[in-house]
Amino acid sequence: MSLSIRVNEKAFGKGSFKTSVLQDVNLTVENGEFLTVIGPSGCGKSTLLKIAAGLDGDYEGRISMNGREIKGPGIQQGFIFQEHRLFPWMTVEQNIAADLSLKEPAVRKKVDELIETVRLKGAEKQYPRELSGGMSQRVAIARALLREPEILLLDEPFGALDAFTRKHLQDVLTDIWREKKMTMILVTHDIDESVYLANRIAILTAKPGRIHKLIPVDLPFPRSRTSPVFQTIRQKVLKEFETTETFSFQEGSGI
């Protein structure tokens, strides 16, 4: 699976009210790659992810998967939002199955497997009000994986969680990626998270967002945040990120 992203321009508004959010973004994500996307606030990270998922078609450019143009959402793309968006009247297993019937043996088997994968064994019958934030996001991850998408797109899914839970779910996500060998693209504000998870990091400039730098992360798994190599890559990413932040400040200040 190769995902080709070309966004000549994405803008909101018309005429004198037009605001360009993304410009001249060209990116290819290879099969099995874990790409993280970082950049200043408002640079269009989440918008780019929604375009890649087929959730936003109002842009100039082309998104294709294995040469086939993506014109809307499909089962080949799984999407996880910043909020878990679980149905409050459904149990964990019902939320994972969503519109599919748990009475179907194949669905039942798949849901049970995913409950094991995201480490929710024993919580199958619980409702969202009984779950912690981390558990709720694990349900959302399992639901996104149910139809076995070719690519999983994640829009800051751990942003609202405490540090301990966040690190735990990063490990869960890494295990899923390594086991299923699927392609993942994750948007984040967290540089440590970006280095911990990714094969490659895309850094966007300030609005309008463009690709500022692509940085490979050549680290074996499992990774240690305290290792010298990890810290070296982190400092490299931070330096490039600060460059985009400085540019954003200068643009806004008229310097």
Curated annotation (Swiss-Prot):
It comes from the Bacteria. It catalyses: ATP + H2O + aliphatic sulfonate-[sulfonate-binding protein]Side 1 = ADP + phosphate + aliphatic sulfonateSide 2 + [sulfonate-binding protein]Side 1. It is found in: Cell membrane. The keyword Acetylation does not apply. It holds the Pfam family ABC_tran. It is an enzyme of class 7 (translocase). SMART domains: AAA. The keyword Zinc-finger does not apply. Its EC number is 7.6.2.14. Its main location: membrane. ATP binds at residues 39-46. Gene3D superfamilies: P-loop containing nucleotide triphosphate hydrolases (3.40.50.300). GO terms for molecular function: ATP binding; ATP hydrolysis activity. Residues 5-231 form the ABC transporter domain. GO terms for cellular component: plasma membrane. It is a peripheral membrane protein. Keywords: ATP-binding, Cell membrane, Membrane, Nucleotide-binding, Translocase, Transport. The complex is composed of two ATP-binding proteins (SsuB), two transmembrane proteins (SsuC) and a solute-binding protein (SsuA). Part of the ABC transporter complex SsuABC involved in aliphatic sulfonates import. Responsible for energy coupling to the transport system. Belongs to the ABC transporter superfamily. Aliphatic sulfonates importer (TC 3.A.1.17.2) family. This is Aliphatic sulfonates import ATP-binding protein SsuB. The gene is ssuB.
